[in-house]
Amino acid sequence: MMKLDTVIAGGRVIDPSTGIDECTDIGILEGKISEIGDLSKREAASYFDATETLVLPGMIDTHGHIYQHVTGKFGLDPDLVGVHSGVTTVIDQGGPSCMTIGGFRHYLYEKSKTRTLCFISAYLVGGLEGHLYPDLYGPCGVNPEHTIRVARENLDIVKGVKAHAEIGGQSRWGIEVIRTGKEIAKAVDLPLYIHLGQLWPTKDSAEIPDADELIEKLVPLMDPGDMLAHPFTRHPGGFVNQRGDVHPILLEAVHNNGVRVDVGHGSHFSFDVARRVLDAGVVPFTLGADMHGYNVSVPSEEDDEARKSNPFLGVAPFNLTIAMSELLHLGVDLKSVISMVTENPAKVLKMEDELGSLKLGRKADISLLKMENGRFTLTDNSGGKETCEKLLMPAGCFKDGNFFEANSPLVPEKIVA
């Protein structure tokens, strides 16, 4: 019998794609999962003690901003968001565009330890400084023909199209750009991913558009498989209407028309809104962290005035596992939360035959988490504080069979209540 490269021993293995949830061992050989079961008598080059550790399919963060330097301070180091945070795959949401996808391929996809994919921006400038300059994102800032061509040429890394539906843009150019984004997505048979919640100031503060009306215009454009982001946003124009209820048209889209929901946590998350949306029966399909340079603290960077005044600034500490912990705290069961970062994102990417599972023969992409018990403080960016009793923290990951420690400075310190 061939000697294994690595045995991950004694962890609680949870894989929603196969239904497994038990304490067992995983064997890795030549970068792939070769065995699952009692491997205590198997010879291996290395052993990883996973006692009291959750062993999951490699986690997939469906909403990252990792096009470092090209998108200014907005883009983070992909490996600090990825493998060194226990995450094996990160999807950059709208950072690269038809003009900058080549750089994304060369500097991220080909060189990062983390698997880096993207939803290409519908806009020519991509995610420049996190869309800080609204005038760059109007009808004159899109070129559907060019974006369609470039997306088709890069389908190995382009897995969707990113656009925005929010009242700042609506006040300037209506929903024309959203229609163009849908045109691009449909032409390349990829999902359209729509940001909800106000980003930009309205053009004329005396004539604030009706955020509820925008939702009514948006939803008919969405097809099964398209995605709505930020269901728990504290900003106007999200899932909750001006009366404080979840939009009926959004409930219909999610429950009956196959539209998917991504958490897109970021600095948008509100406990109050999250409870309203979850109580209405909307359970997100995927859980993207939405970390970027203005909502996490990077110790090596100066906390300058420009950063502090940025409209996308967030102060509540979070990462993917904190976002997972918040959903657990709000009553979503562990298996469903794990599905949101494993098998479900793999389906979004149309890569369920490669990612999101611990099936034998798959790439050895494996995330390791610690479930800590106690009393911990969770904070949102509206100032809300809640106490949870279970906190998920990254312990590391294996990517293609290689181990990475969860030593990213972006991993928040736990706050004991």
PLM feature spans:
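Metal-associated gating/positioning segment near the N- to mid-region
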Residues: K41-R42, A50-K111
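Divalent metal-coordination and catalytic microenvironments
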Residues: G11, I26, G31, E52, ...
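His/Asp/Glu-enriched, well-ordered alpha-helical/loop segment
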Residues: R275-M371
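Metal-cofactor-binding active-site regions of metalloenzymes
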Residues: S85-I91, G95-P96, K111-P139, K162-G169
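C-terminal cap of metal-dependent C-N hydrolases
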Residues: G11, K363-I415
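Histidine-rich, glycine-flanked metal-binding segment
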Residues: M1-P57
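Histidine/acidic residue-rich metal-binding segments in metalloenzymes
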Residues: G103, V142-V261, G266-F285
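Active-site mouth loops of central-metabolism enzymes
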Residues: T62-K73, H131-E145, G169, D204-E207
